[in-house]
Regions:
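Alpha/beta enzyme core
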Residues: 2-250, 254-279
Length: 279
């Protein structure tokens, strides 16, 4: 292992290293793709040990790590910083880095160079861009240079002010038709996977069936080829955020509060440290 935090092996018996070929084969073999976000070494290390396939260093860190209301304030330098820590903790999972707001929207050449910078400075397995037809040329340029790309359709958080809120997308016939078209365009441009966020399950099923490349859903129903959640959401660290597409597999906020309260009590009452915890 690259770090010394833990030495336990992963619980999965799958491939030693997840690559784009492995992800493609999972769709063909009807094996669901498990993806979570991570923003630091220790969390990424634990996810890798647990057998996660994809780790997304998401610009969602702007909300869950930095406390912003949107992902928009996150910078490219911040994404690179967090990605470096994540990559040090992982042996098996494929790591994808979100390209943050305004790192690629100005023009394709700037986006292409910034994607290259992410790959060179972090060692990530690929990058993710939000958008459909408008980023097709950028995706093509990036893939042609040897950089794997994941697309992102539906609710795209970097366009939150344009949408007017975190409401589901693809709910009208015109939106659904355009999303199907965008998905095919991204596939033809060379994307190896597409994230579908907060769209009707029936539409996600149609998109998934229409593509040779896999889809990974978040709030997009059960018919995608894989699922992704923000790790702090599924671990129950944010009690104030509970949309119906999030399942809490733990309630760590309660555990952390209780543990810290016990620590504070022991320190105040001079019960920590004791002799066996001293040198």
């Amino acid at each position: 292992m690259k770090g010394s935090f833990m030495k336990n092996s992963t619980t999965t018996s799958g491939p030693k290293k997840v690559t784009t070929k492995v992800i493609a084969a999972m769709k063909k073999g009807k094996t669901r793709i498990a993806c979570l976000t991570a923003y630091d070494y220790i969390t990424a290390h634990l996810l890798d040990q647990a057998g996660i396939d994809l780790i997304l260093v998401g610009d969602s860190l702007g909300m869950v790590f930095q406390g912003h209301e949107t992902t928009l304030p996150v910078t490219l330098d911040e994404m690179i910083y967090h990605a470096k820590g994540v990559i040090r903790g992982v042996d098996r999972a494929m790591i994808i880095v979100d390209m943050p707001f305004m790192s690629y929207q100005a023009n394709d050449e700037e986006g292409f160079r910034n994607a290259g910078r992410v790959m060179k400075e972090t060692g990530a397995g690929g990058v993710k861009f939000e958008g459909g037809e408008r980023i097709a040329n950028l995706v093509h340029m990036t893939v042609r240079a040897g950089i794997p790309v994941i697309g992102h359709l539906g609710l795209t958080p970097q366009s939150i002010h344009q949408f007017g809120g975190f409401t589901p997308r693809g709910v009208t016939p015109d939106e659904a038709k355009q999303m199907l078209r965008d998905a095919k365009i991204l596939e033809e441009a060379g994307a190896f996977c597409i994230v579908l966020e907060k769209i009707p399950a029936s539409l996600a099923a149609k998109v998934t069936k229409s593509l040779k490349i896999p889809t990974v859903g978040i709030g997009a129903g059960m018919h995608c080829d894989g699922q992704v959640l923000v790790v702090s959401d599924m671990l129950g660290l944010n009690e104030d955020f509970h949309p119906r597409f999030v399942r809490h597999y733990a309630h760590l906020s309660e555990t952390i509060r209780r543990s810290v309260s016990e620590y504070v009590k022991d320190v105040k009452e001079e019960k920590f440290p004791v002799q066996k915890e001293s040198y």
